Each structure stands twice: as structure tokens, then as C-alpha cells.
Amino acid sequence: MDFLDIAGKNFLVFGVANKKSIAFAVGEVLSEAEAKVVYSVRSAARKESVSKFLPDADIFLCDVEREYEIKELAENISKKYPKIHGIVHSIAFANYEGGLKPFHETRKKDFLQSVDISCYSLVAIANAFKDLLDKKASVVTISISATKMAAEPYGFMAPVKAALDSTICFLAKSFSSFSEIRFNSVNPGLLKTSASAGIPGYLDYYLFAEQLTLRKKALTTKEVANTVAFLLSERASGINAQRIAIDCGMSVNYFDKDIITKATRV
């Protein structure tokens, strides 16, 4: 028996954009374990592009900014899948048009739109799918490791992700009144994804983060996906309302002697 024991179970994955997406890597790991993976993307154009590299996948449409579409998605999926055993929420958006600005110059509409798409969407999805989820299902969202640091390349996305981390605690508590459904976040360090490529100056931070890892090798999306798959399985039944950091030890290595030498020697 496969360790994860998820063969034949149904999982809904939000947020796949291309082969560099965390959502894509999660789908691969779940499929390798013989689970059924269902995808949700935000537009017909995205569905068309995703279908090119996932030709046999069952792909649904849902723009999470429109709450009625989330409800329609649950209804449409329920017609084909009587139970969903897990949901992966890999959705985030921040409008960096015009480049990164000092945090205090963040526009209200940009901040609130980011909260709506990146954070509130999880609440709306959980509510819409509560009757379709198996009573021991698992919901995993993708956050970031740097919500407590003023990491400039993330801009206002960091406090939005901090709100997301808090949200899982309240969802876990709320759902505990009628189920054993678990909510957790996976909080990776810096990754090479298409989304991160759009962040001004991100590459320099990514290369610096790689030097800070204990192994001196950057984190991969496959490593993040493996952790997500574990949390989705009942092997992780004791883990609920938790923030799981995956950063290859970066967060304990800020005083690495090689980094210090480079910074203090001219």
C-alpha cells in the first residue's frame, strides 16, 4: 500500500497556471499516488492553456472574485464527484502595476483586491464546499514563509498572507463543530515560479535566499508539493490549524559565516 493511501480519492486543486506552478506540482504528486485530481482555473483562456499540458484533466472554471461562481463550481463538481477528500488553495494576486512602492503608499483598492483573491477566497470556497467535503477531508493553502519579516519584494502580499495564515485557524475551529476537516497552510521559502518572476527584483532575493539555506541549494516546488500531499492524506490526521514552514533551514541561518564574510569584507 502506498504510504499516503490516497488512491481513488478526489482532490480539487485551485490555481494551476503552468508547469512551474505549485498547483501543478501538487497535481503531479497526487496523480502519482493514483488519486483523482480535479482542477479549477479562473478563465476560459487559462483552461485552454492548461489543457495543453494536462490534456486528460478535468478542468472547471471559477473566478474567485465572483462569489456566485464559487457556489456554481461546487454545484457543478457535485454532479460528477459525490465527495471531495481534499482541496488545495494555491491562489494569490497582487497588483504591482507600476512597480513596487513603499508599503505606506499601497492603494486601498489594490490591498483589498489582494485580500479578496488571496485570502477571503479560501473562506468562500470552504463554505461553498462544506457539504461536498468528506468529513475527514483536508484543506491546504499556500502561504509564504516571510509574513513576519518586512521582505520588500513581497510588498503588501506579506500582510495579506499573514491574514491567510490566521484564517486557517478560524476555519479549523469553525468546521470542528460538525466535522474532522483539517485546515493547514504550507509556507515555503523563495521559489522559482511564474508568479514570482513578475515581482520586481525578485531574482536577487531568490539567489540570496538560496545562500541562506543550510544545504546551499534552493527549495523546489516538488518539495513543497510533497508536503502538501502529506497534509492532504490521513497520515497527517493530527495536524490541524498549523503553519508548516518549508525553507530548507533558511529561517535559522541568518548568521551564516560565509554570508557574514561577504557582507563585512570588501
Regions found by a protein language model. Name each.
Residues 240-266:
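Short C-terminal tail/terminal secondary-structure segment
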Residues 213-224:
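A conserved structural motif in NAD(P)-dependent oxidoreductases
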Residues 177-182, 239-241:
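Short, small/polar-rich loop/turn modules that mediate ligand/substrate recognition or access, typified
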